[in-house]
Amino acid sequence: MTDPEDAVAGTAEDLVADARSLGAPASTRMVKDWVEHGLLARPQFRKTTQRGSDPGLFAREQRVLFRKILEAKRRSPLPRVPHHTVVPLIISMWLNDDRVITDDQARRALRTYARSAGARSHASRTATARAVIDQFAHPEASKQTRRSVERLLLDGEKSRRPRWDTLVPAMKDLAAPWRHDADGLARLDARTIGLPESPVTFDYAVGLWMVKGEVTQQLERESIPPKALLLAREEFRRGWAEYQNDRAALAARGGESAALFTEPTGWEAKVREHVDSFATTLGRVAGLAEPIFDEVRAGLRRR
């Protein structure tokens, strides 16, 4: 195949020939690896004799996808483009429509993506924790409080079992220290982000972070039921379309939090935002979010 417009269904050998026509090294083993990681759907089984079968056929759309991924990899300045940098595009395509990416392929792509997210370096995890802290930390929060919350966040993400009885009070001390007004009366000065009519508190933001961590773990284990994935996609697809229509207006009303609603620059950043945002909806639909927020609420009551 030299032109995607001329594409027809093909075997793994056909895909290898396509790759070599582009000057890219390829083998049937590489094609199988792409299938395993969700970059390609499984080929369609063809039984042609009583005792055997012909090589499976990759759908026309998958053959075109294979070529486009190879072309994108060739344009990359990196000497090697790992799978986890490609799978967000596969997942984003699946979230948008049903025409190219199969549900089975999407599950494997989500597993690959989750494995990459779960294998983040300590430096990356620390940067994420500090970004969350910086969003909410009250100007009067001490460095000691910041360090304490950072340590608790990192320990909680690593263990998947946050110490809510310790973390929630520490979060409150960070985001809402006790202050005194002009009359000398003590009051709790809570710091939030987002829109005035629907502010996001620090404990809620950390709860969402933990939900995403739990979703990542479950996707890595492939333990989220396929039905939940499809239901979450259906709901997310509607909500994401509405958000895209509203985000400019939300940014205009966001004040200091306007950056939360600003669309990222570059298609790669947009794809990653799209995929990362799916985790929250999936966590709720799959029943993973409520137990986590129950723990957060219990921690708040114990304060």
Which residue ranges define each predicted feature?
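Polyanion-binding surface elements
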Residues: M1-L40, Y113-A114
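Short acidic/His/Gly/Ser-rich catalytic and metal-binding motifs that mark active-site loops
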Residues: R42-Q44
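Arg/Lys-rich, alpha-helical DNA-contact motif
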Residues: T2, R46-R303
